[in-house]
Amino acid sequence: MNDFPWLTIIVVFPISAGSLMLFLPHRGNKVNKWYTICICILELLLTTYAFCYNFKMDDPLIQLSEDYKWINFLDFYWRMGIDGLSIGTILLTGFITTLATLAAFPVTRDSKLFHFLMLAMYSGQIGSFSSRDLLLFFIMWELELIPVYLLLSMWGGKKRLYSATKFILYTAGSSIFLLIGVLGISLYGSNEPTLNLELLANQSYPVTLEILFYIGFLIAFAVKSPIIPLHTWLPDTHGEAHYSTCMLLAGILLKMGAYGLVRINMELLPHAHSMFSPWLMVVGTIQIIYAASTSPGQRNLKKRIAYSSVSHMGFIIIGISSITDPGLNGAILQIISHGFIGAALFFLAGTSYDRIRLVYLDEMGGMAISIPKIFTMFTILSMASLALPGMSGFVAELIVFFGIITSQKYFLISKILIIFVMAIGMILTPIYLLSMSRQMFYGYKLINVKNFSFFDSGPRELFLSISILLPIIGIGIYPDFVLSLASDKVESILSNYFYG
């Protein structure tokens, strides 16, 4: 037990401070914006301080743990704790949310509610990553959905209500399976029902029951990740949402699904995961090819980037399915890497939209001359997305490849086939990313069109782009910074498997 409740403060602070914002005097939007940014920066500094001085890298066990009785009647505890698996995602959440609030400066309608919802989402996401109790994990998982739905339905494109409804139907529907899995796994086995993740990790189940639990959790996390064919909400949602919301969706929300797969499916249900991993490997491989093939056919700029996210999530699924040290480390690195890259691409797509008010690629063209700074940043981050050496995406995908090669679970011929198909996916990635850049920035379409006022990125946008680019290059040059956080935890998870 930790003496000081660091994690409780980190989880509760954003939503509590955000609630106070609702009582601020109506003095325009600037007060709300700066207040929210100050809260996010303070929260990020607090999180960094707590982790720097209290987190031990070489300890795979739960740290900063807190355990308070909450509801006596249900024997329900407020259990918090972090390990190598959650520390990276929590810091990523803080970083991306802070930048997303800065990106939301152009939002003027219902500014107070918009910023409060962003802070409520922040609390829900950190709560999900630091929960050590299954029911608390479920509550945080659901808490985070409500702000996302409201952000989608109130701020966005013309079809925002359709995309928000589709999002909530998918995610709320999958949450039913998550709740059934949580209740089933906690009530089975011991005489006393338990929701403590540490105790559940040592529990064993009959094979049929474990498979049923696994399928329930897999459906819930497959929608969030997303894994095909449960991905169709994502392009619509990204296509209509405001770009600051897109940053949070691509940077953090999708990573919650991958985190759940490792934290619950892999850690609590190792036998079922061992049985399902070949199928997940096949799905992940198909996903890379499918999304990379579908992306070039998208006219909408943000939908094309959304399909690139689906393709990149395929590498995470393959890494998790390899059940090897490099594979799982590569998947965790890809979670962090794509969090930065996805958020950056959506931000730059949004800044381009702010200038030309066009969403369809075939209507764009010739913007490179007018907005050279945005063009430069977009090109660099497109290169990061297609895994250029020296960028974080390259290292993550390379380590996932090593994970497949070293896996003891698969035959040589199947490993060669998987690597071959993944390589085709990696060849298709530059095709849709570079053609996207060509359609936006090259050619002559918009140069001679009247009533288009082009102005290049200002200090705020340039600062934001560089802030996301620096960690991408930093992780690409020195990936051990992220890998060292999770390596001991990865080994302890894989110790439940007979190979790897």
Swiss-Prot record:
<keyword id="KW-0874">Quinone</keyword>
<keyword id="KW-0520">NAD</keyword>
<keyword id="KW-0934">Plastid</keyword>
<dbReference type="GO" id="GO:0009535">
    <property type="term" value="C:chloroplast thylakoid membrane"/>
</dbReference>
<protein>
    <recommendedName>
        <fullName>NAD(P)H-quinone oxidoreductase chain 4, chloroplastic</fullName>
        <ecNumber>7.1.1.-</ecNumber>
    </recommendedName>
</protein>
<feature type="transmembrane region" description="Helical">
    <location>
        <begin position="167"/>
        <end position="187"/>
    </location>
</feature>
<dbReference type="GO" id="GO:0008137">
    <property type="term" value="F:NADH dehydrogenase (ubiquinone) activity"/>
</dbReference>
<dbReference type="Pfam" id="PF00361">
    <property type="entry name" value="Proton_antipo_M"/>
</dbReference>
<keyword id="KW-0472">Membrane</keyword>
<feature type="transmembrane region" description="Helical">
    <location>
        <begin position="305"/>
        <end position="325"/>
    </location>
</feature>
<feature type="transmembrane region" description="Helical">
    <location>
        <begin position="272"/>
        <end position="292"/>
    </location>
</feature>
<feature type="transmembrane region" description="Helical">
    <location>
        <begin position="35"/>
        <end position="55"/>
    </location>
</feature>
<feature type="transmembrane region" description="Helical">
    <location>
        <begin position="330"/>
        <end position="350"/>
    </location>
</feature>
<feature type="transmembrane region" description="Helical">
    <location>
        <begin position="134"/>
        <end position="154"/>
    </location>
</feature>
<comment type="similarity">
    <text>Belongs to the complex I subunit 4 family.</text>
</comment>
<feature type="transmembrane region" description="Helical">
    <location>
        <begin position="462"/>
        <end position="482"/>
    </location>
</feature>
<dbReference type="GO" id="GO:0042773">
    <property type="term" value="P:ATP synthesis coupled electron transport"/>
</dbReference>
<keyword id="KW-0150">Chloroplast</keyword>
<dbReference type="GO" id="GO:0048039">
    <property type="term" value="F:ubiquinone binding"/>
</dbReference>
<feature type="transmembrane region" description="Helical">
    <location>
        <begin position="242"/>
        <end position="262"/>
    </location>
</feature>
<dbReference type="InterPro" id="IPR003918">
    <property type="entry name" value="NADH_UbQ_OxRdtase"/>
</dbReference>
<dbReference type="InterPro" id="IPR022997">
    <property type="entry name" value="NADH_Q_OxRdtase_chain4"/>
</dbReference>
<feature type="transmembrane region" description="Helical">
    <location>
        <begin position="4"/>
        <end position="24"/>
    </location>
</feature>
<keyword id="KW-1133">Transmembrane helix</keyword>
<keyword id="KW-0521">NADP</keyword>
<keyword id="KW-1278">Translocase</keyword>
<feature type="transmembrane region" description="Helical">
    <location>
        <begin position="113"/>
        <end position="130"/>
    </location>
</feature>
<dbReference type="GO" id="GO:0015990">
    <property type="term" value="P:electron transport coupled proton transport"/>
</dbReference>
<keyword id="KW-0793">Thylakoid</keyword>
<keyword id="KW-0812">Transmembrane</keyword>
<feature type="transmembrane region" description="Helical">
    <location>
        <begin position="87"/>
        <end position="107"/>
    </location>
</feature>
<feature type="transmembrane region" description="Helical">
    <location>
        <begin position="416"/>
        <end position="436"/>
    </location>
</feature>
<dbReference type="InterPro" id="IPR010227">
    <property type="entry name" value="NADH_Q_OxRdtase_chainM/4"/>
</dbReference>
<keyword id="KW-0618">Plastoquinone</keyword>
<dbReference type="InterPro" id="IPR001750">
    <property type="entry name" value="ND/Mrp_TM"/>
</dbReference>
<feature type="transmembrane region" description="Helical">
    <location>
        <begin position="211"/>
        <end position="231"/>
    </location>
</feature>
<feature type="transmembrane region" description="Helical">
    <location>
        <begin position="386"/>
        <end position="406"/>
    </location>
</feature>
